[in-house]
Structures are given as structure tokens and as C-alpha cells.
């Protein structure tokens, strides 16, 4: 049994539920013959990967859906061996080079070299190039991005790249200038409500419009999250009711409790407890950027107007440090410690003002 988010994922550009004008433009791009490198970007849950797979289906036909998982071992110049998992068909290869950490440059060079030098076995597709899909390009090191730029030029005749990321701000200009940028905006609340209603109708379920809207708003316009929450509601209670509780993910509840612990007490002992909770989130593969963003959102609820600006500025500083560093826990803990000091001083100053 597959999840709704996979079961009802559109497989062609013609069947996409929203951004249909963009889908028509992508279809024209595929049919024109001169297919460029693509840089597909947009927020999480907007449908980037779905559109990329639809493009591949338009390029090569149904063969791209015959996927296999491959494990490759790449040896770095320092003789270090790196295990990389890829998803491949006869026509394309999908890889996340940032999984290799600081060795991502070697992974990119080896992967692209291997794909570009292999010939197509099936000529029925009438495409003389293969496609390499690189995900989370914005997390690549600068060395890897420069290596990617050189490799793009070298193997242009036999290989096309589709780069996928959340934001182009961390992608170097030479790569951006060599790709056709395709922005996939987050779906509107109405779009998400429409998709939820359609999926529930196909499942034979009656979804109240009020609940559909609550799901769409709670998902922050993330369609994948909305579908997962809707399916969780179905497991929790059916028939649906307009005011039924929408289940939250465990890590979101845990993060809210962590924020409440920070606000309730500002001591070294509490900081040590919070550090342990942050470690717990990181070991469960919650990205540090998501932790920082969620923590900031929860903490701002307990700040007044004057303090909000300082806390937001402080979070931006430590988020930047987070991107530059390699140990996320240091920067998350530093943000919490700085917030504790700022919040404690703010509360003490407020009490003094009330007394006098």
C-alpha cells in the first residue's frame, strides 16, 4: 500500500493540477529539440521533483519509470572511499552529491564522467543525450559548484543536467547563467484544497471544505505535507468532521516544547537540557536549517515588538554561521544561549520598570 502522495503523483505534464501555463511551456521546451540544462527551484512541497519526472517522461517515454537503486563506491585522491546511492533508469541518473559532504566535488566529476561517456542502448527515444538530475544543489560546496560548471561545458554534447534546489541564492552565478531557470512557486491555498478534494474523491471519501482549507493553511502551502496530514486524519478519524484535530508531526511538537523550555527558564542547567533536545532532533535527521527556522517561529510568539527585531536579526546571523560551519549543534546552541541572555535581560529590565 503506497501513500497518497506517491499514489496520486501526476506522471505527465498534461496531468499536473496547478501551474498549467508553466507545464505547457515546459512541454514546448521538450518538443523544440534543443533541450538546455535546467535549474529548477522553489519552496519545499511545491512540486519541483514531480515536474522534473514529468519532463523526463516527455523526453524519453515510459522507460524513465523503470527505476533501479544503485550503490557506487568512489575513491577520492586521498584514497578515501565514499558510498553513494543513486536512482537510475536507462535514460537518467539521480544523485544527491551533498550526501558526500566535503567530497562532493569528486562525486560530481566521477558521476558525470561515467554517464557522459556511456552510450544509449535504446535509440528509439531519439535523444542522443542522457540526463543527470542533481538534487539539493544549493548545499554543494563552492569547489563542487565550480567543478560542476567545468563539467557542464565539457560533456554538453552527451549529457544534460537538471539541477534542483530550494533557493538559487547559494548557487554560483556561472552555473545560473548556463542553465534555464524554472521557478516552481508554492501552490495557492485554493490549489491545495482542490488537490485534497480530488484525492479524497478518488479514495471514496467525503472531505469537508472547511477541513480542506484548515489542512492547506496548516501545511504552509506545502502540498506534500498537506496530503500526508490529510491521510493521517483519515487514519485517526473517519468520517471527517469540520473541526477535527489535525495531527502534527512528533518533531514539531518536540520543537515547540523545546522553545517553551527556553522561555520558561534561562539557566546553564536549562541550556544543557536544550542542547540534549537539539541533539535528539539532529540525530533523527531533522535538518538544522529547519530546526533554526522552527525554533525562531516558536520563540517569536513570546517576544514583544521591540525584542522580535533583535531576535530575528540574531537568528539570521547564526543561520549564516550555520551555513559556513560543519557542526550544526554549535551554532544552534549559540543561538539559544544568546536568546536566553537577551530574553532574561529584557524580563529583568521590565520588572525594574514596573517596580519604579
Swiss-Prot record:
SUPFAM superfamilies assigned: P-loop containing nucleoside triphosphate hydrolases, post-AAA+ oligomerization domain-like
Protein name: Replication factor C subunit 3
Family per similarity comment: Belongs to the activator 1 small subunits family.
Gene Ontology annotations for the cellular component aspect, listed alphabetically: Ctf18 RFC-like complex; DNA replication factor C complex
A GO term for molecular function: DNA binding
Residue(s) carrying N6-acetyllysine: 20
Listed Gene3D superfamilies: 1.10.8.60, 1.20.272.10, P-loop containing nucleotide triphosphate hydrolases
Amino acid at each position: 500500500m503506497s501513500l497518497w502522495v506517491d499514489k496520486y503523483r501526476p506522471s505527465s505534464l498534461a496531468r499536473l493540477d496547478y501551474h498549467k501555463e508553466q507545464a505547457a511551456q515546459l512541454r514546448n521546451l521538450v518538443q523544440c529539440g534543443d533541450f538546455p540544462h535546467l535549474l529548477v527551484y522553489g519552496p519545499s512541497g511545491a512540486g519541483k521533483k514531480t515536474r522534473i519526472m514529468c519532463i523526463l517522461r516527455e523526453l524519453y517515454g515510459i522507460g524513465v519509470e523503470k527505476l533501479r537503486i544503485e550503490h557506487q563506491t568512489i575513491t577520492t585522491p586521498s584514497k578515501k572511499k565514499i558510498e553513494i546511492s543513486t536512482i537510475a533508469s536507462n535514460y537518467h541518473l539521480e544523485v544527491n552529491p551533498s550526501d558526500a559532504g566535503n567530497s562532493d566535488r569528486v562525486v560530481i566529476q566521477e558521476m558525470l564522467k561515467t554517464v557522459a561517456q556511456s552510450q544509449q542502448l535504446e535509440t528509439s527515444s531519439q535523444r542522443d543525450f542522457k540526463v543527470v538530475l542533481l538534487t539539493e544543489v544549493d548545499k554543494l560546496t563552492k569547489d563542487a559548484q565550480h567543478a560542476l560548471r567545468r563539467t557542464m561545458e565539457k560533456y554538453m554534447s552527451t549529457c544534460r543536467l537538471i539541477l534542483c534546489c530550494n533557493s538559487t541564492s547559494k548557487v554560483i552565478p556561472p552555473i545560473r547563467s548556463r542553465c534555464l531557470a524554472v521557478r516552481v512557486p508554492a501552490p495557492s491555498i485554493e490549489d491545495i484544497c482542490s488537490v485534497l478534494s480530488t484525492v479524497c474523491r478518488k479514495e471514496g471519501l467525503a472531505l469537508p471544505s472547511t477541513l480542506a482549507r484548515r489542512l492547506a493553511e496548516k501545511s504552509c502551502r506545502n502540498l506534500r505535507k498537506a496530503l500526508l496530514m490529510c491521510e493521517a486524519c483519515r487514519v485517526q478519524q473517519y468520517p471527517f468532521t469540520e473541526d477535527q484535530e489535525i495531527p502534527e508531526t512528533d518533531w514539531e511538537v518536540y520543537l515547540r516544547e523545546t522553545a517553551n523550555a527556553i522561555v520558561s527558564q534561562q539557566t546553564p542547567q536549562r541550556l544543557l537540557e536544550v542542547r540534549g533536545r537539539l541533539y535528539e532532533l539532529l540525530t533523527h535527521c531533522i535538518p538544522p536549517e529547519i530546526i533554526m527556522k522552527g525554533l525562531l517561529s516558536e520563540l517569536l510568539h513570546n517576544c514583544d515588538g521591540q525584542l522580535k527585531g533583535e531576535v530575528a536579526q540574531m537568528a539570521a546571523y547564526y543561520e549564516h554561521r550555520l551555513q559556513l560551519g560543519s557542526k550544526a549543534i554549535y551554532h544552534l546552541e549559540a543561538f539559544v544561549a544568546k536568546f536566553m541572555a537577551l530574553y532574561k535581560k529584557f524580563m529583568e529590565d521590565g520588572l525594574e520598570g514596573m517596580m519604579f
